[in-house]
Swiss-Prot record:
Classification via SUPFAM superfamilies: EF-G C-terminal domain-like, P-loop containing nucleoside triphosphate hydrolases, Translation proteins
Name used for this protein in its record: Peptide chain release factor 3
HAMAP family given in the database record: Rel_fac_3
Family designation: Belongs to the TRAFAC class translation factor GTPase superfamily. Classic translation factor GTPase family. PrfC subfamily.
Organism: Pseudomonas fluorescens (strain SBW25)
Principal subcellular localisation of the protein: cytoplasm
Keyword terms: Cytoplasm, GTP-binding, Nucleotide-binding, Protein biosynthesis
GO biological process: regulation of translational termination
Superkingdom per UniProt: Bacteria
InterPro entries: EF-G-like_DII, EFG_III/V, G_TR_CS, P-loop_NTPase, PrfC, RF3_C, RF3_dom_3_sf, RF3_GTP-bd
Boundaries of every tr-type G domain copy: 9-277
GO-annotated molecular function: GTP binding; GTPase activity; guanosine tetraphosphate binding; translation release factor activity, codon nonspecific; translation release factor activity, codon specific
Entries under PROSITE patterns matching the protein: G_TR_1, G_TR_2
Length: 527
């Protein structure tokens, strides 16, 4: 096996998906602790102190305790290199989350044991299903009261339409939580409370049918053995192929806050989840072990570091190897660029990178030339598919408090739009600036970031726009005719694309009927 193939085989790139408050930030920290990437996990409960969760880095996230932006963390674990992508936990950020899920090979679903499957989890699973992403499941919060575990598995199967195969099974919960039993390998992992901040040696009891196990379970022993018989009779056994096909999820139980069970999940990702997978481009399928470099940008993030006024483009490497100072072709612009200062995200510590392989996520400094969906290669003309822009559902007109700052406002909005955090439209017939978003929180985020990072204060006004549609028409004459007729409702988006802002649903239906040669698109691929 070549050095490159060996490095690719070591890579595991996955994202965490969950409903807000299911414990995603906590589990992220504990995973980093496993990889020794952070020495002490600052519990999310001590939010008021300075120990903010390592992955929630933007000011507004610190205040609200939700991860709004996707951060990327890389850490070593058991001779592997793990790339963990944290996805926004708030329902408003579906676009950002969707794009993040295009950059991973597997996902970890975190469920709150007291609540089970929640709406946000369902939406994220729908996205994973589009690509048959393999899913590992973690039922969290066993240090509190949880629902009946069998009921939780039934719910996963019924609601998420995926087979659930329990790997570990909880022994009690809340104050009676004694640990978990490994179904296939017949041993108990003992839970001891109060070790949330550090890695501790794990106590194991070999064999359920042993005096030690009887002593540990006490009066619960017989009831637990009966429950296990029921579980083993009723539940699916783990099947590696079904897992890789996205049809079955292995289920683990634990408490992220108590730092228990997180290592079992990480072991599952390393042992069972796929190494970097081939990627489909319009031109051909790209294999990760190919010698030539290729990668695509799935996210742009402004101002990751208040000390550096910068924008970072996050790129998933699809093939080949990145070497410091190498020359790459920016396919959309046709320009060759030398990349000497790509970053790796070693738990939000930004480090200069010497080399990286397929599956890794690297950061490129972006001075406004890179867009989401851009492909970089060593010369070949490739464009990777499936990185969409969605038409926003909510619109507001932006009003500037200080008219002298209109340049900063435009610059700020342009950069935030490049990030995909919002969409910005400039109407052809007025000097208005219109923002589009998928959820209300995005407007708050934009206003707070404009104030925080660009020192611009703005407010919003309602505007009658029902929806936006990207205009596509191969007949130039027809397009010109349409543009003249519809000019009152036409705008250009942040990327320079012609957009129709429909005032009502009826208007949109009429226009589509009246102009059959013009395509009104609700999504637009980044390319």
């Amino acid at each position: 096996m070549t050095h490159q193939a060996a490095e690719v085989a070591k890579r595991r790139t996955f994202a965490i998906i969950s409903h807000p408050d299911a414990g995603k930030t906590t589990i992220t920290e504990k995973l980093l602790l496993m990889g020794k990437a952070i020495a002490v996990a600052g519990t999310v409960k001590s939010r008021k102190s300075d120990r903010h969760a390592t992955s929630d880095w933007m000011e507004m996230e610190k205040q609200r305790g939700i991860s709004i932006t996707t951060s990327v963390m890389q850490f070593p674990y058991r001779d592997h290199m793990v790339n963990l992508l944290d996805t926004p936990g708030h329902e408003d950020f579906s676009e950002d989350t969707y794009r993040t899920l295009t950059a991973v090979d597997s996902a970890l679903m975190v469920l709150d044991g007291g609540k089970g499957v929640e709406p946000r989890t369902i939406a994220l699973m729908d996205v994973c299903r589009l690509r048959d992403t393999p899913i590992v499941s973690f039922i969290n919060k066993l240090d509190r009261d949880i629902r009946d575990p069998i009921e939780l598995l039934d719910e996963i199967e019924a609601v998420l339409k995926i087979k659930a195969a329990p790997i570990t099974w909880p022994i009690g919960c809340y104050r009676d939580f004694k640990g978990v039993y490994h179904l296939a390998d017949d041993y108990i992992i003992v839970y001891t409370a109060g070790h949330g901040h550090e890695r501790t040696d794990v106590k194991i009891i070999e064999k359920l049918d042993s005096d030690e196990a009887r002593a540990h379970l006490g009066d619960e022993y017989d009831r637990f053995v009966d429950q296990l018989e029921l579980v083993q009779g009723a539940c699916h056994a783990f099947n590696q192929q079904e897992f890789l096909d996205g049809q079955l999820t292995p289920v683990f139980f634990g408490t992220a806050l108590g730092n228990f069970g997180v290592d079992h999940v990480l072991d599952a990702v390393v042992d069972w989840a796929p190494r970097p997978l081939p990627r489909v481009a319009n031109e051909r399928t790209v294999e990760p072990v190919e010698e030539k470099f290729s990668g695509f940008v799935f996210k742009i993030q402004a101002n990751m570091d208040p000390k550096h006024r910068d924008r970072i483009a996050f790129m998933r490497i699809c093939s080949g190897k990145y070497d410091k100072g190498m020359k790459m072709r920016h396919v959309r612009t046709g320009k060759d660029v030398r990349i000497g200062d790509a970053l790796t995200f070693f738990s939000s510590e930004r480090e200069q990178l010497e080399e990286a392989f397929a599956g890794d996520i690297i950061g490129l400094h972006n001075h406004g030339t890179i867009q989401i969906g851009d492909t970089f290669t060593e010369g070949e003309s490739l464009s990777f598919t499936g990185i969409p822009h969605f038409a926003p559902e909510l619109f507001r007109r932006v009003r500037l408090r200080d008219p002298l700052k209109s340049k900063q406002l435009r610059q700020g909005l342009q950069q935030l739009a490049e990030e995909g955090a919002t969409q910005v439209f400039f109407p052809e017939r007025s000097n208005d600036i219109i923002l589009g978003a998928v959820g209300v929180l995005q407007f708050d985020v934009v206003a707070s970031r404009l104030k925080e990072e660009y020192k611009v204060e703005c407010s919003y006004e309602p505007i009658t726009v029902y929806s936006a549609r990207w205009i596509d028409c191969s007949d130039k004459k027809k397009l010109e005719e349409f543009s003249n007729k519809a000019v009152e409702n036409l705008a250009v988006d942040g990327g320079g694309h012609l957009t129709y802002l429909a005032p009502t649903r009826v208007n949109l239906a009429l226009m589509e009927e009246r102009w059959p040669d013009v395509k009104f698109r609700a999504t637009r691929e980044h390319h």
